[in-house]
From Swiss-Prot:
Keyword entries, A-Z: Activator, DNA-binding, Metal-binding, Nucleus, Transcription, Transcription regulation, Zinc, Zinc-finger
Name of this protein: GATA transcription factor 24
Signal sequence extent: none
Domain Tify: 73-108
Single Gene Ontology BP annotation: regulation of DNA-templated transcription
Function according to Swiss-Prot or TrEMBL: Transcriptional activator that specifically binds 5'-GATA-3' or 5'-GAT-3' motifs within gene promoters.
The gene coding this protein: GATA24
Compartments where found: Nucleus
Primary subcellular site in the record, as a coarse category: nucleus
Superkingdom of the source species: Eukaryota
PANTHER family reported for this sequence: GATA TRANSCRIPTION FACTOR 24, GATA TRANSCRIPTION FACTOR 28
Single GO cellular component term: nucleus
Family as reported in the entry's similarity comment: Belongs to the type IV zinc-finger family. Class C subfamily.
């Protein structure tokens, strides 16, 4: 330490804390704080350059190495500031070799040989200052730029429901309607199927109507109507030419039955006449019974 108290040593009395603060800087206006290490630039706007570091009060304890090394370049006239127990020592025109010797003697730290000339990004500053554990924060211009990019990108995102009326109109014109309302293709197919079935049923009804208009079929052997027999059967003249009884006789024996033993077939008119005669006969019998009862009394 004797060679550092040389010709240009100046002692300044001030208020400081126990950690020794060593500053190696250029001629300029700088503000040194033990906690935050704030640096103010020169009034002319130029960036003065220098090296600043904190040296612990106990050299043997490596846990107290909470220091900073800020590089601002090397020029001819450099200052070395030592603060210890409230006293500040300032030395002018100190070579980097002497500062290196002091750092090695006190803290075992070395000054990098090639020091950057300008202050870089916060990440680079933290790496130079030895504060790798501190969180990285973007500067204000970078944050503004990122916010602007995010807002521009957000403008491209459209979360609103935009209604394209032209497209909707084309779709509406292509869709099928029933009584003015939209219907699906399935329902339209069902409707077409139902209309087809209705048409088929109507056609069958028309066929039935035409069938009712056909002449009544009679048995060609006995003259029995098709309505009076269970079914018409095949005969020698073809299908549906014989009544049920004649057709069975023909199918089993190959001959037609004898009509002399069979009562004549009764037509519906004959049946109605027989019913009327039976009713009249019953009425006469009832009258006779009532007459006999009155005579006995």
């Amino acid at each position: 330490m004797d060679d550092l108290h040389g010709r240009n040593g100046r002692m300044h009395i001030g208020v400081a804390q126990n950690p020794m603060h060593v500053q190696y800087e250029d001629h300029g206006l700088h503000h040194i704080d033990n906690e935050n290490s704030m640096m103010d630039d020169h009034a002319d706007g130029g960036m003065d350059e220098g090296v600043e570091t904190d040296i612990p009060s106990h050299p043997g304890n490596s846990a107290d190495n909470r220091g900073e090394v800020v590089d601002r370049g090397i020029e001819n006239g450099d200052q070395l500031t030592l603060s210890f127990q409230g006293q500040v020592y300032v030395f002018d025109r100190v070579s980097p070799e002497k500062v290196q010797a002091v750092l090695l003697l006190l803290g075992g730290r070395e000054v990098p040989h090639t020091l950057p000339t300008t202050l870089g990004s916060p990440h680079q500053n933290n790496r130079v200052l030895g504060l790798s554990g501190t969180p990285q924060r973007l500067s204000v211009p970078q944050r503004l730029a990122s916010l602007l990019r995010f807002r521009e990108k957000r403008k491209g995102r459209n979360f609103d429901k935009t209604i394209r009326y032209t497209v909707r109109k084309e779709v509406a014109l292509r869709m099928q309607r029933k009584k003015g309302q939209f219907t699906s293709a399935k329902s339209s197919n069902d409707d077409s199927g139902s209309t087809g079935s209705d048409w088929g049923s109507n056609q069958s009804w028309a066929v039935e109507g035409t069938e009712t208009q056909k002449p009544e079929v009679l048995c060609r052997h006995c003259g029995t109507s098709e309505k009076s027999t269970p079914m018409m059967r095949r005969g020698p003249d073809g299908p549906r030419t014989l009544c049920n009884a004649c057709g069975l006789m023909w199918a089993n024996k190959g001959t037609l039955r004898d009509l002399s033993k069979v009562p004549p077939p009764q037509t519906p008119q004959h049946l109605s006449l027989n019913k009327n005669e039976d009713a009249n006969l019953e009425a006469d019998q009832m009258m006779e019974v009532t007459g006999d009862i009155s005579n006995t009394q």
